[in-house]
Regions:
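Disulfide-bonded cysteines in secreted/extracellular proteins and peptides
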Residues: 19-22, 26, 36, 84, ...
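Conserved small/polar residues in nucleotide/adenosyl-binding loops
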Residues: 183-190
C-alpha cells in the first residue's frame, strides 16, 4: 500500500525530494529509493511503500527486547518490518534489513489486526523491533495510537538514527525505548555504511 510521507522537502529546482525521516536525509531522485529502500520519490512526492507489510509477528517476553524494568514479566507483541537506514556488517537480522527483496514471505496486515492480536495473546505492549522501526513511521504511528486507546504500551527498539522531526512524532506515542548503540564516531555518516 502506498502512503505519502509527511516528512520530506521538495526541491525547488528539480523533482528530487529530501527525506526527513532519519538522519541520513536522503536526497532521492524521481523514481528512486532512499537508503532504507522503503521510501520512493514518485513525481516529487515521497511515498512509503511498506505500509502494512511486516516480516515478523511474535508474542515475546518483554525481557527479550531487552527491557528489564518496564512491565517486567509480561508479554509484548513484537512487530518487525523490512529495511534499515544503516548498513552494519554485524547485523543479526540482515535478511529482513538488507536482503529482503529475496524474501517472498511477506505479511500484509492492518493496524487494527496487530492491536487485536496483541490483546488476544495476552500482551501488555507492542514492540517495534527486529529492523529499524523509524523507517515505518506512518504505519507504526497509526497502529500505536490505536493500541494506546486499548491500554497497550508502545516500545521502540531502535538504532536511534532518526531526524528530530521523526523523534517529535515518535514521542507522541512511545512509552519505552531501547536504543541499540551500534557505533560511535565523530563523523555522523561513519556509522551508516550503506
Amino acid at each position: 500500500m502506498l502512503v505519502i510521507s509527511n516528512l520530506f522537502k521538495k526541491s525547488s529546482k528539480s523533482r528530487k525530494v529530501r527525506c526527513e525521516i532519519c538522519a541520513n536525509y536522503c536526497k532521492i531522485a524521481d523514481g528512486a529509493y532512499g537508503i532504507c529502500k522503503q521510501h520512493k520519490n514518485i513525481n516529487g512526492e515521497l511515498f512509503d511503500e511498506s505500509f502494512g507489510i511486516v516480516s515478523s509477528l511474535n508474542a515475546d517476553p518483554i525481557e527479550k527486547k531487552p527491557l528489564y524494568h518496564f512491565l517486567p514479566g509480561t508479554l509484548t507483541y513484537s512487530v518487525g518490518g523490512f529495511g534499515c537506514n544503516m548498513g552494519c556488517l554485524h547485523c543479526q537480522n540482515y535478511m529482513i534489513s538488507k536482503e529482503f527483496d529475496k524474501i517472498s514471505d511477506r505479511l500484509n496486515i492492518l493496524p487494527e489486526t496487530i492491536v487485536e492480536n496483541a490483546i488476544s495473546q495476552g500482551c501488555k505492549s507492542i514492540a517495534w523491533t527486529y529492523n529499524e522501526p523509524t523507517i515505518h513511521l506512518p504505519f507504526n504511528k497509526k497502529t500505536s495510537l490505536l493500541g494506546r486507546r486499548k491500554n497497550l504500551k508502545i516500545i521502540y527498539v531502535s538504532n536511534g538514527y532518526m531526524s528530530s522531526q521523526a523523534l517529535s512524532e515518535i514521542l507522541e506515542f512511545v512509552d519505552a525505548f531501547n536504543i541499540c548503540l551500534l557505533y560511535t564516531s565523530p563523523s555522523p555518516r561513519d556509522g551508516a555504511t550503506s
